[in-house]
Amino acid sequence: MQIISSYGVELRKQNIPIRQTLEIYRSAVSYLIGIYVQVWEELAEIPDAKRRFNAAEHLVHTTKKNHACFDFDIRFPKMPSYLRRSAIQHALGTVSSYKTRLDLWEKTDGKSGKPKLVYENHAMPVFYRDVMYREGAEGKDEAYLKLYDGHDWKWSCVRLDHTDMEYLRKCWSGKKASAPTLEKRHRKYFLRFSYKEEVTLTKTPVKEQIICSVDLGINTDAVCT
């Protein structure tokens, strides 16, 4: 059986443009949501998810063989390609969810509140390896992220919490981690890494097994039984 574990590494306080990067990424997602809701009927006719994504990207990104219909490249110049595609994917998911909820609402004769399309979002960027994320020197509590400084996208060295890095080196050394996702909790920023591993399930009869369940309450602490 394959399981996925994740761990957040805190970014130490320093003068790096994390907030600016997050703001421009979320602005890009909001802008794309506004575009895709306008052309959703056209996009919805494409059943294949990959082809739909490609069509959505062609609408906003100009290449030698394609002229974009919208001015995304002008509004968000030099945005790294992987980050742009991440924003497109998030926007498509948001509009698709909204349209699905709207269809269900219409089928129920509008008995409940009409769904609203929310442009403000809490999307968090993924720092894809090599193009947006590079590991620091072996044994160093640091990494390199491509961040937006208000004018351009540049590589910045970020210091990582020593205790968190020691845990990763001790428990996950040699295992491949996914591209880290930026996370914000209690006014602090983290890079969340995910790890895949294979585990062998026990052959003990179900009635003889000890089961641990965790109830993650919305307004209460977790309850374990």
Predicted segments — roles?
Residues 1-225:
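Nucleic-acid substrate recognition interfaces
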